[in-house]
Amino acid sequence: MKKITLALSAVCLLFTLNHSANALVSSPSTLNPGTNVAKLAEQAPVHWVSVAQIENSLTGRPPMAVGFDIDDTVLFSSPGFWRGKKTYSPNSDDYLKNPAFWEKMNNGWDEFSIPKEVARQLIDMHVRRGDSIYFVTGRSQTKTETVTNTLADNFHIPAANMNPVIFAGDKPGQNTKIQWLQEKNIRIFYGDSDNDITAARDCGIRGIRILRAANSTYKPLPQAGAFGEEVIVNSEY
């Protein structure tokens, strides 16, 4: 009888251990959820392009005026905006309406901004083509500015190709960049925000999206490709 009891106990123990092992196998860990080839292969239906493809699409076309947004398009300028928020309005975005912040940002704080590699490639390409380069930003205008010189120096833009930065400002309910794209006869406009792409579309010109870096202070991140526009690969840096 004792042997039978021991045997039954052993069977129960094995069953319990086996059940526990199966539970561990069949219950995925929330810490390590894993993935599969279908998820890895999943891509957003976006019109991706490279700088080389953009250059190829311009083959045979004469020099033209091209435009760039500045913040998160050609410069990772979050350090200056981060400093501005901490200095002028730690608990809100009111610093963006403060002229004192813009005086600082437009007169030296871009020394802390990091030029984006995709911007180097694009600007180099347009300089080789002989295009006229404009920078149209939503920043507020100030009495003086060093942004033009900073951009020309960082991206080695010859004086023949460079134009003074256009400070379009920000007005509620109005896309302030449209009038400048039209006035300067800009044919291609690069930008990271939805306003950049819609401004180009409203002007009937080619709008090309540059990805905003994930660690930008400008949140939320836009949905690149949401308007069917071209989006440059690896353009977040």
UniProtKB/Swiss-Prot annotation:
It is an enzyme of class 3 (hydrolase). Substrate binds at residues 137-138, 177. One of its GO terms (cellular component) is outer membrane-bounded periplasmic space. The keyword Hydrolase applies. Its main location: periplasm. The active site is at residues 69, 71. It catalyses: a phosphate monoester + H2O = an alcohol + phosphate. Its cofactor is Mg(2+). Pfam families: Acid_phosphat_B. Keywords: Hydrolase, Magnesium, Metal-binding, Periplasm, Signal. Its EC number is 3.1.3.2. GO terms for molecular function: acid phosphatase activity; metal ion binding. Residues 1-23 form the signal peptide. Dephosphorylates several organic phosphate monoesters. Also has a phosphotransferase activity catalyzing the transfer of low-energy phosphate groups from organic phosphate monoesters to free hydroxyl groups of various organic compounds. Homotetramer. Belongs to the class B bacterial acid phosphatase family. This is Class B acid phosphatase. The lineage of its organism: Bacteria, Pseudomonadati, Pseudomonadota, Gammaproteobacteria, Enterobacterales.
